[in-house]
Amino acid sequence: MRVYDLEEQPVRVDATTVSGYRNGGEDSLWQFGHSKDDPTLRQIKAMMATLDPLGLPLGLEVVSGEQADDRLYVPMIDRVLACLERTGLLFVGDCKMSALATRAHLVAHEQYYLTPLALVGETAQQMPQWIEAGLPSVPPRS
């Protein structure tokens, strides 16, 4: 057996759903949930973390289909951190990973994140000022 030290590449974390014509029930993973595909079908949800550039799976959690994505990030991040035992990793995710609690969890564990902010609430109103404040002064063209 050989063991290789993988370089610290970005860790991608995202959820997806699988829907189908399945019987559900209280104890079933197959539940109705928010669906981009067909809300009349039951679904299961899978949260996965992979290591770039290989797409190497680091963790997979399958849950019932009615669960929200944002509550699945921290447990998956913790699973990855237990596996890699490193600080300074870059976690990449969608806007659901931008929840303040998830970002705070990453910072508390000395990790980095790259995720778009969800344009809801005060974020949508304040973002133009943040961008303006971050841009260098550019003299007008003559």
Task: Describe each model-derived feature in a short phrase.
Residues 1-142:
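Anion-binding and metal-coordination hotspots
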